[in-house]
Amino acid sequence: PVRRPSARVVIVNWRQAELTIRAARSIREQLGGEDVLVIVDNASGDGSAERLRREELTVVESSENRGFGAGVNLGARGMVEEVLVLLNNDAVAEPGFLEALLRPLSDPPAAAAPAAATARILLAGRWKPAAPGQQDVLVSPRTGRWARVDDEAASRGEGEVLVNSTGNLVDASGNGYDRDWLVPAEREHSPSEVFGLCGGACAIRREAWRTLDGFREDLFMYYEDTDLSWRLRERGWRVVYVREAVAHHEHASSSGTDSPMFIRVNVRNRILTAAAHSPAPVVMQALARTLVRTLRGPQRGPVMTGLAQAVAGLPRELRRRTRGRARRSSTSAEHR
């Protein structure tokens, strides 16, 4: 039988020790003898680190909260394990998750072998189509508006299980999004090939992670996985979706999707990521889409702030793009 690779599992915590403990418990019992679980506490300052250590977890403390990407990079620093596995602190891994996620990465690195794998992430709870005017709903342009049913109704089997992600896609305006978002789980039969990984539950070979220098830290949060997926693709590396590796995710437990901070950072990072990787028409589409949102939408303030921050960062992204192409050309020349 093929030996499965060793794994370092990294979970990032910020002021949500109990959620993080739940996530850690779900994956800890799946670890093999060569695997390591590392919890990064992003300067919570609320006693989280001490609470996590009482669970006999390995905790690495950051001196400041520099965002999700920086937290993962800190947790992965110095790793000797063969694969880095990421699990959101507000997710729970089903039994067999780790074994299934690592299976496509068991073969030695080769041109045809995938460099990363992304899990089947389901939304926690059960959901039903939302009533007209109902608030606190999730929306998909493909499947409509959904409201979560209460725990009692869920225990009776009411509602449906919905997909959160089967990987990452990018549209014509540079918007990174989850494939199969809010598709009923029983209807999801997506292919294994996918553009990119979802950072909420995924795995990447150590060699690929090191070659790419991990996540971009200046994005702080959101779009780190889209940016990393772009860089994997630009190197010619594949990402595969593993349907058997299942995790359940409490959507937006760590930061609400309607908060001004979420909107500002999302707008900024979408444009910056498009500028770093996409063709010029996509960058223009991203800018145009944001201008339309600014004029029409109710969240003008944070959208405008995010747009201004993105425009200020465009020269840096174009330089990054040029340097990246030069590095890839140099690497290609070395291997010819």
What annotation goes with each model-predicted range?
Residues 282-336:
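Non-catalytic, C-terminal membrane-associated alpha-helical segments of glycosyltransferases
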Residues 84:
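Short aromatic/hydrophobic "clamp" motif used to bind/position activated sugar donors
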Residues 195-246:
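A short, conserved alpha-helix in the catalytic core of glycosyltransferases
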Residues 26, 41-49, 64:
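A conserved acidic beta->alpha catalytic loop
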Residues 62-79, 89:
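Glycine-rich, basic loop-to-helix element that forms the pyrophosphate-binding segment
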Residues 95-164, 168-175:
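Conserved donor NDP-sugar-binding/catalytic core segment of glycosyltransferases
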Residues 239, 258-282, 301-317:
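Catalytic core of nucleotide-sugar-dependent glycosyltransferases
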Residues 25-34:
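Short, acidic, metal-binding catalytic loop of nucleotide-sugar glycosyltransferases
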